[in-house]
Amino acid sequence: MCLFSPTRLLPLLFVLVGLNASGAGPVFNVLDYGAHHDGSASSTEAMRSAIQAAKAAGGGTVFVPAGNYVTGPIELVSDLVLQIDAGATLRFPAAKLPFTKGRQQGIECLTPVPLMGGHDLHNVTITGRGVLTTDNAEWLKIMPRTKATKDDPGTANGPNWERLLQDLEVKTPAPDEDYQKAAPELRPSFIRFMDSTNVLIEGIHFVGSPMWTIHLLYTDNAVVQNVIIETYPGVHTDGIAVDSSRNVRITSCYIDTGDDGIVIKSGKDADGRRVNRPTENVSIVNCTVHHAHGAVALGSEISGGIHNLVADNITCRGTAIGVRIKSRRGRGGSVEDVRFNNWTMEDVGEAINVTTDYQMEGEVKASEEPVSERTPVFRNIAISGMIIKRAKLAIDIKGLPEMPISGLRISDVIVSAKSGMRGSFTDALELRNVQVNADNGPAFLIQDSKELELDGVATRKPLADAPVVRLERCPGAIVRNNRAFAGTGTFLSVPAGELKNVVLEGNVLDGAKKPVEEAELILNSDTRNQERVIP
């Protein structure tokens, strides 16, 4: 039975009004307001004065000509075009900043003001071929760090933040002194728009970032295009974070970062469900991601839901993961009607990772619990048209026993990897025209899944000592139109007594020494994660 329906993936129709980079109204040159284009002194006040002049005029363009400028945080206003000309570099030194309302780790709280952006704005454009730069390492120096090693300067947030976070998660009023203690442990986003509409960011080159580079929070109708983000190896310097926002288009961007390239979020646990603002109608097209934890990552903060997303024509190289969709017990929320098409990946850790059983290093694994608002739901996800070279792990799918991942379809994928596909706790998983060429283990190991359909799966690298397909506890499985190539030892292996649960149709298995066998278990759910390489 196929629960997946392409018609359920709603078209992404964006009415992007008011996003005109050419601007309207007068032009305000920051040099006329005392900016220092040689970097000899701070231009913070000049930037502020030019922006306020544009505001007083009812809108306009603030122009930053070529030169080197040193500035503190820049608060934008509505009906504004900030044009940063080619040859202009704005450098933001690390500093302790005042607090404003925001969201940190999916929890509403006070956060440092962003280096650029604003709250409750409309019709704002940041454009040009200029450079915005800061030094992630300098921001880390002003923070107390824990668990530091020669390879990792330590966790992003220290014990004071963790204590504050615990208060916020249960909505206990946090004393001002707790915020003051946590302040040195927090960093701002480079650009953040909150509760804003009609936002355009285009052409800008980011070099370094304190934390997230572009953060769209509670924002409707936003475009990020032709942007270059180079923050690798900065700690937690995600490229573009779309957080409880709607109608967002990200196109033709290059991102080289030490964290996720493009990350989609909607709040964490009880606070995220209280806010209850999904991220929806997101289009990500023609982007390249280098390094990064995940090229395009959804979660794990999905408590408000993520709906109607397309990521098409993406190239990633050297990322820990390519496609990453993650959540865990306690989050709640749903990820549904999302599509990943036409990707190329090289030298990645895991090519495709979809899990509702995510846990960070050092966390205690959550125990199984009855289905409730705390249970995350993944359904109607399509992944297709991918060529993947030199992955460590091809595909990793893991749902929850109490809430399997439903309606996941993977099609037209060719992947070479050290280890093959592993999947568990799914409902109506479909693999169509999927080729996994793995160095070891079964090419396809699927456990505890019902209504599974394998149509046209294969390996061009058969192993004499491992089956191509291993199914364990998979009632209602259909295995059809598959081919065993010469040199295959066993094509399909199932535990003793389970072959009756599998329907075989139209397979060409004469290349296998054993087309089908019933054998003792070779792997179990506890060993399936031994090849995991992700942070």
Model-predicted regions and their roles:
Residues 1-11:
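Bacterial N-terminal signal peptides that target proteins for export
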Residues 23-535:
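Extracellular/periplasmic carbohydrate-active domains that bind, remodel
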Residues 14-22:
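Hydrophobic h-region of N-terminal signal peptides that target proteins for export
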